[in-house]
Amino acid sequence: MASELKVDKFTGVTTAGSIDVTSGSTTTNLQEGLAKMVINYDQIADSIRSSLNVSSVSDNSTGDFTITFTASKTDINYSPSSSSLAYATSDRIGNFVGVRVTSGSTPNARSVGLFTGSLRINSGYGASASGAGNEADADANCVQTFGDLA
């Protein structure tokens, strides 16, 4: 017999913001598994189609933009995930989008785009007639982050 539970709010007994879910012998924390930021951003039109926990986006240059969070992260050890698609070009295959890393002669001299209040992203061509590795604006930059909020 199927059951249905209708509630407006779940609250943990020992910790209000922490709820464990058990499936078989595996237990996972519900809050830790939820995306804390989600965005579908059109860099060509400079418009946000859909978002969660995003206060703004700055279009820095071709294939380079910064997402500013409404609620900050606790640290820079969160996990971003992304995908990109350029509808407006014939080079639809092989696009990339990921965390921006500036060049430097050593790993310590490089700058990574992970910040507690924002995330800097690059998009471009992975392999195409327009140039492998070239930065380019994409119609659909979909980015999500997982990790604790401050």
Q: Which residues are covered by each model-predicted region?
A:
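Intrinsic-disorder/low-complexity loop/linker signature
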Residues: 25, 83, 105-107
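Extracellular receptor-binding modules and their adjoining Ser/Thr/Gly/Asp/Asn-rich linkers
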Residues: 3-4, 9-75, 133-150
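Intrinsic-disorder/low-complexity peptide segments enriched for small residues
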Residues: 3, 28, 83, 112, ...
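Extracellular jelly-roll beta-sandwich "head" domains, especially the C-terminal globular C1q domain
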Residues: 89-150
